[in-house]
Amino acid sequence: MNKVPLLEMRNITKSFGKFQALKGVDLTVFSGEIHALMGENGAGKSTLMKILAGAYTTTSGEILIEGRPWSIKGPKDALNAGISLIYQEMQLAPNLTVAENIFLGSELSRGGLVQRKEMVMQTQAVIDRLGAQFKASDLVMGLTIAEQQQVEIARALHRNSRILVMDEPTAALSTRETHRLFELILRLRDEGMAIIYISHRMAEVYELSDRVSVLRDGQYVGSLMRANLNANELVRMMVGRPLSDLFNKERDIPLGHLRLNVHHLTDGAKVQAVSLQVRSGEIVGLAGLVGAGRSELAQLIFGVRKATGGTIEIDGVPLVIHSPREAIRHGIGFLTENRKEQGLFLELAAQDNITMATLERDACYGLLDRKKARAISDDAINRLNIRVPHAQVRAGGLSGGNQQKLLISRWVAISPRILILDEPTRGVDVGAKSEIYRIMSQMAREGVAILMISSELPEVVGMSDRVYVMHEGRIAGELHHPDITQENIMTLATGVTEDHKKEVYHD
């Protein structure tokens, strides 16, 4: 690294009215460095980067580029400083070509005529440098999300940007697309670019970053070099407490009667003769690899998928559940895996999302009782600590953690007997995870039977009283404490037999 930082942000303060979003934040970034920026939602990461990109102006503080003070009052000042920011939501015109997007606002012209051929040639040269598969003449609307991201990066390279800010760039990418993006980021770093990488995903930070800086409550907490990265320390810096305190599972909750009894449940495709039980007050983990049939099993119980065999009993009563409406009537709640596509109504208010499952129960002669709906939503917002200014705020404008808690509150509102949670903390930061774990533990104490599907093994180990592991549509095994370990779960999830365990783990 060079001794003189490429970028210094010193004592940056930003206020919105009486609210102070940033309180004297410092950030130093060098050329040829991938610098991860971490923190809970609301910690100030996006605000700090919007100041750097010229979307916001500072209340106080200064920005230096290569040791020289640089005034950034708007996006043009940031571009002149060699700074580009790639937002989570792509800033592209879908009905224009790649070349037209690259040159948007700075079109090449001669004699009053736009030089389209030259623009295409220059754009294609940048695309080839990236190793992308699309062409400069392709319409952006026909590209994948990963390819659109490459267009954003190509635009930054065309502008000769030296500092590239990426805000949660893998949120909508597949595993393969993420791997390709990482290869590109590492190549850009090796070419001397400074990359500020905003993410809440520790695995990505461990794989990519040369250094990590953490913000908490609008303040700079500290930085760690790659050699010193430690999950416990990162969590402590982000939330003010160690990783061991993250899981809020109470082990002294007395278990009640058998609440959910699934026997030989089958759909003829993804789920084969699955049997499991969950007691009142119990959190049961359901682990397994992608494609093992976990989500499909949950959909069978909730009536989304049709069972071809097997039985479901709730509190000892055999039931045939044909639809989600019937499941809700029987006191079953289901947090879906993808909150944006299968759970939330993003354009509706928080209150409407919360009360969606109680409409049939609380309607009077087919009319919504608005006073009761408001009371239900206000109670849920307070109980789950959902950070919204009011109940009428649009759900799509909330952070990932608050969206997830909003969806959980929908099922809390029906006072469920059984709650199925499919990837309950996917896509949320550490602080929101801790809140969700607290909610789960509280509901278990109130007697709710919880079936938790999760691909995060520390979560399964930390929150489960028992664990079922699925492999190829069947239950491969059941684990009790102290045998609930990541190694034992993976052994069952991958179909490794007792005869091969020693070979796999100790070869």
Curated annotation (Swiss-Prot):
Q: What is its EC number?
A: 7.5.2.7
Catalysed reactions listed for this entry: D-ribose(out) + ATP + H2O = D-ribose(in) + ADP + phosphate + H(+)
Q: Which UniProt keywords apply?
A: ATP-binding, Cell inner membrane, Cell membrane, Membrane, Nucleotide-binding, Repeat, Sugar transport, Translocase, Transport
Q: What is this protein called?
A: Ribose import ATP-binding protein RbsA
Q: Which GO terms describe its cellular component?
A: plasma membrane
Endpoints of the signal sequence:
none
Principal localisation: membrane
Q: Is this entry keyworded Lipid metabolism?
A: no
Gene designation per UniProt: rbsA
* ABC transporter domain mapped to chain residues: 7-242, 253-497
